[in-house]
């Protein structure tokens, strides 16, 4: 699986904070034994403005891009539970965010809360993520984070909601986040089976 995430912080804009993801599902055979089926290549994307109540959870500072990049990285796994059990190459255009995600540590308490949620949720999803740097100009997720959908339209990408995990849950124990991941993945699996039967 290939994942790109991005964040935008433009304090002078009407919508100052935005997060986005793009996910590429390669064509592949899925299932086991005689139940195997071919699933065609597809793209999905999502973006959203970060609400004020979420921004108020961050420590006051002039620059929030680091926290927003981490929020985008967590949000894609929360929004796309089909990433469960997958090997993921995840591209981000912010080296500080990549370092924090790899180490699982930040000296900033608000960033540390996001990293805690990411680590626990990833364990619950059983997703194996490999983080790589991508220059901003080559990061396809930079486009939806700035309300540009032309290329994604050409790729036939389907829009999905970008779901920011509820902040009230961010301080929950790791076990709760793992259970949350399993529940979301199971719900998505049931919905996907329903969509296939309806075809």
Q: What does each of the following model-derived ranges do?
A:
Residues 1-13:
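Two-metal-ion RNase H-like nuclease active-site motif
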